[in-house]
A protein has these predicted regions:
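Short beta-strand elements
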Residues: 559-579
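Glycoside hydrolase catalytic-domain context in secreted enzymes
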Residues: 1-552, 556-557, 580, 584-882, ...
Length: 887
């Protein structure tokens, strides 16, 4: 009898366990350990399924109650009936809950999980691997080569120092990450190139620590693993290494990722919140590396001790910098025995093979820097206005001190990266050689080149330059002629930098003595500056001021090789009151973002940067401006009634016009047929299209729109939800470092083919934000500190995937140039000139030149106005760029 009573209880327990297993299996199916699910995600998912879970729980509890009641009944027939009903109720609870969840709130996610095919074709895999290696061949940058120490002789024995040699950085974390499980390691690359490495040293490092500390959504650990000198000495590492070889290769690595900016000091104190959820930051688990005077982008104390010993014991030392962020590298010139240095950021699946080939001389390096490398990162103009700052009086609006509003000031204005350093040197503010170690665009080669302007044609609207490049060295190589313009400047007038990249190309592989003619076309209007302060225009406009424009052929942003001077006789003001819009614009560009300026003091060239100290100082006023309080979008203060319009007319919905989405291919933007199609949408469909769009576009029956599958990311096909991962390409920063538009296009053609193989139509990329600060966590995922270079790479990439029918969602639009507080509606203050000339520039170029048809918004506010509902940013500031095109 007791056994009979146990059976229903066992069944009830089994039902509950099965429901739990179903949930776990669903989680594994959807995420497979690949996606980093946050607490907020779980809470959101539960909230979506609340109704279904409540119904299931009620039925399950009812079943359990019925079983318990049945156990107490003496009538056997009634007992059996209640047992059956209880079991049926519990089974129904499982079936109903799972089905209503799968076909209700989680339908879109499940559809995404089960989408497409599961494999990339062999042909496309091979094409991708070849392209990835070509990118690394041309993206790795030679920084130093004293006495032609490189390339190394074939068969050289190498002592490879630095813990990062056994755990190098292949890419970054987050949406821009990639699957490096099949990657060729750094040591693999050396071995394939014919080098023999010290296996004792390799084993020593591997035994010290096998995994790289995580910088990700779940935690931030800035530990820089490296053994102590005592551990080196106890293992007799240096003595044995000297017996193995007199040549040392030192690898210094730094990682980064989405959700976290990098530590500006390695102290015990968490001086600002880093990460999406404010996770605690571990600065180092190695106490002797904790140093409040040092940042994550400097050598750690243990690394210095290791380098001291290595440079003492080995006469030829080569350094590899494996970091997507510019590091402080002054020490490269402080050790006499460091003869060579190579910059190798995030090389991906096969990029370390390229490193081996460059070290051996099989490949001549032709990469160039996309950022300026300075000696002191704590002295850059943005350093005091990067991090977490909060207004102290938002509780006046919400009534609660728990509701905070973060903000950041883009205090440097247009003087970002090299534009500051080149201009500051010209104005006498800095001694360039004391501040800058490696200029923007810098890169050495194993050969030498001569470049000169051979011919110039100038019709007053366009300048055509012919540049002759000749290989004057002994080995074949590629060269990048760079064109910068230096515009006329009036003290106190429109802000202008002395160096502005406006053209670059990469030559073919030139044999010794071989020459190539490279042609550049420069439109005068592209040298216009945006007059957001309304100095020469009533409403703001692009202005090409009268005067001499120096068109400089350069090897990098600082070294001028040849110059052509173009003269503009009178101001050209591109507004309706003067000379009309620029020819590349669809409508005249005027100010729409005056409110974004706020109450910030911005860096100005006036008086030789007279306000430098004031403008670069950190915030001193943490009071939220009254206008900002009125406009700031917050769930705490949101009032839907503010959007009520008594005169609003309900649009037509649910019309039966007989149109299908497929009928609209090639239909002109202004064709009324679009209105007829949109009239067919129902209210429910409109809500679904607007509110249910993560990694997909929902199927919409009224217009026959199919379900569209979408995925990350900027570096590789990176589908967290489906577990579908493509080739791990070098990160976008290395793609940009090739300075090759052809390779950028080839890169995205390969990713586009992989997207098609997997069945994806939408692609969350490319990442086009700016390297405003070296400590930004996602610099690996973005191209450069320069808007024009970023735009050129983006144009090549977007044009390539558009040809394959892929929708590229260029991101993150706009001013998403750090990770700190990015998801908290951070108020971002900047001048409209800087926004247009630098941060919007890549987006503008992509729309104009590559017919870009997708944008992913950032989560911040421009000024105090949330970008998601900011019509000025979404429409008005872009509408001048190009005639809108529906796709």
């Amino acid at each position: 009898m007791k056994k009979k009573k146990l059976i229903p209880c066992i069944i009830a327990i089994v039902a509950i366990v099965l429901l739990g297993i179903a949930g776990v299996k669903l989680y594994q199916l959807m995420f497979g350990g690949a996606v980093k699910v946050q607490t907020a995600d779980i809470i959101s998912a539960i909230a979506q399924m609340k109704l279904q879970l409540i119904i299931g729980a009620v039925i399950l509890i009812a079943g359990i109650v019925i079983l318990i009641i049945g156990l107490r009944k003496k009538d056997e027939n009634l007992k059996d009936l209640l047992k059956v009903q209880g079991i049926v109720a519990m089974v129904l609870a499982v079936v109903i809950t799972v089905n209503t969840v799968c076909f209700g709130p989680q339908y879109s996610n499940l559809s995404t999980v089960l989408s497409g095919t599961t494999a990339i074709s062999e042909e496309h895999i091979n094409e991708s691997l070849e392209a990835a290696e070509a990118i690394a061949d041309e993206g790795i940058t030679l920084l130093k080569n004293e006495g032609n120490a490189l390339p190394l002789a074939s068969g050289t024995k190498l002592n490879v120092f630095g813990w990062s040699s056994v755990a190098p950085v292949y890419g970054g974390a987050g949406s821009g990450s990639s699957d490096s499980s099949k990657a060729a390691s750094l040591l693999d690359g050396l071995h394939e190139a014919g080098f023999e490495t010290n296996t004792e040293l390799e084993n020593f490092y591997t035994n010290f620590r096998s995994e790289r500390p995580s910088i990700s959504f779940f935690g931030v650990d800035f530990t820089i693993p490296e053994p102590t000198m005592e551990e080196f000495q106890n293992a007799n590492i240096f003595e044995n290494a000297k017996a193995f070889s007199d040549t040392a290769l030192v690898v210094i690595g730094r990682s980064s990722g989405e959700g976290s900016d990098l530590a500006m000091n390695l102290s015990d104190d968490n001086n600002f919140t880093i990460g999406e959820n404010g996770e605690h930051v571990t600065f180092s688990t190695q106490e002797d590396d904790l140093d409040a005077e040092k940042s994550y982008l400097e050598l750690s104390n243990r690394e210095i001790a290791m380098l001291d010993e290595v440079t003492k014991d080995f006469k030829d030392v080569i350094v590899v910098i494996n970091s997507a962020q510019p590091m402080e590298l002054g020490w490269l010139d402080q050790y006499d025995n460091i003869k060579g240095a190579i910059y190798c950021p995030s090389p991906g699946q096969v990029g370390f093979r390229s490193l081996g080939k460059i070290l051996s001389g099989e490949v001549n390096p032709s990469g160039h820097l996309v950022d300026t490398f300075v000696y002191d990162l704590h002295a850059i103009p943005t350093i005091n206005n990067f991090g977490s700052f909060h207004y102290t009086d938002y509780e006046d609006v919400t009534g609660s001190a728990d509701n905070i509003v973060p903000f950041v000031n883009y205090n440097e204005g247009i003087y970002v990266g090299y534009k500051f350093y080149e201009t500051a040197a010209e104005e006498g503010l800095i001694d360039y050689d004391e501040v800058v170690q490696y200029p923007f665009g810098y890169g050495l080669s194993y050969t030498s080149f001569d470049a000169e302007i051979a011919d110039t044609q100038d019709d007053g609207q366009k300048i055509t330059l012919t540049v002759n490049v000749k290989n004057t060295g002994d080995v074949a190589g590629k060269y990048v002629p760079q064109i910068y313009f230096n515009p006329p400047y009036t003290d106190g007038g429109i802000e202008k930098a002395t160096a502005n990249l406006i053209g670059y190309e990469k030559t073919e592989l030139l044999e010794p003595g071989e020459s190539e003619a490279v042609t550049f076309e420069i439109a005068y209007e592209d040298m216009a500056s945006y007059d957001s302060n309304k100095i020469k225009s009533a409403d703001g406009a692009y202005v090409l001021e009268a005067g001499d424009y120096q068109i400089n052929l350069c090897s990098d942003s600082h070294h001028v090789l040849d110059t052509y001077t173009a003269t503009v006789d009178t101001d050209r003001i591109y507004d309706d009151a003067h000379d009309g819009k620029r020819s590349s614009d669809e409508q005249t560009a005027t100010n729409h973002l005056d409110y974004a300026k706020g109450n910030v003091t911005y860096l100005s060239r006036a008086g030789h940067f007279a306000n430098y100290e004031e403008s670069i100082a950190g915030p001193t006023d943490f009071t939220m401006p009254e206008e900002a309080k009125e406009n700031y979008a917050s769930v705490v203060t949101f009032d839907a009634s503010k959007y009520d319009d008594a005169d609003a007319q309900m649009p037509t919905t649910g019309a039966n016009n007989g149109l299908k989405f497929q009928d609209m291919a090639g239909v002109d933007y202004d064709d009324e047929k679009w209105d007829s199609l949109l009239d067919q949408l129902t209210i429910d469909e409109l809500k679904e299209l607007a509110g249910n769009g993560t990694f997909h576009v929902v199927a919409t029956s009224s217009i026959n729109l199919p379900y569209i599958y979408e995925t990350d990311g900027p570096t590789a096909v990176n589908s967290f939800f489906t577990g579908k991962f493509g080739t791990a390409f070098p990160a976008p920063i290395m793609v940009a470092s090739t300075w090759s538009k052809e390779l950028a296009g080839r890169f995205r053609t390969c990713i586009g083919n992989e997207l098609c193989d997997f069945g994806f139509t939408g692609w969350y990329g490319p990442g086009m934000n700016i390297h405003r600060n070296a400590f930004s966590g996602r610099n690996f995922e973005y191209y450069s500190e320069d808007g024009y270079l970023s735009g050129c790479v983006a144009v090549a990439e977007i044009a390539a995937v558009r040809k394959l029918g892929i929708i590229p969602y260029m991101k993150h639009f706009v001013l998403n140039d750090s990770e700190t507080d990015r998801a908290r509606g951070i108020c971002t203050w900047s001048t409209e000139q800087a926004i247009r000339e630098i941060y919007l520039k890549p987006f503008e170029m992509a729309i104009k030149e590559a017919d870009a048809n997708g944008i992913m918004n950032s989560k911040n506010s421009i000024g105090s106005r949330w970008i998601g509902s900011n019509a000025d940013v979404q429409n008005l500031s872009l509408i001048h760029i190009s005639e809108p095109t529906r796709h």
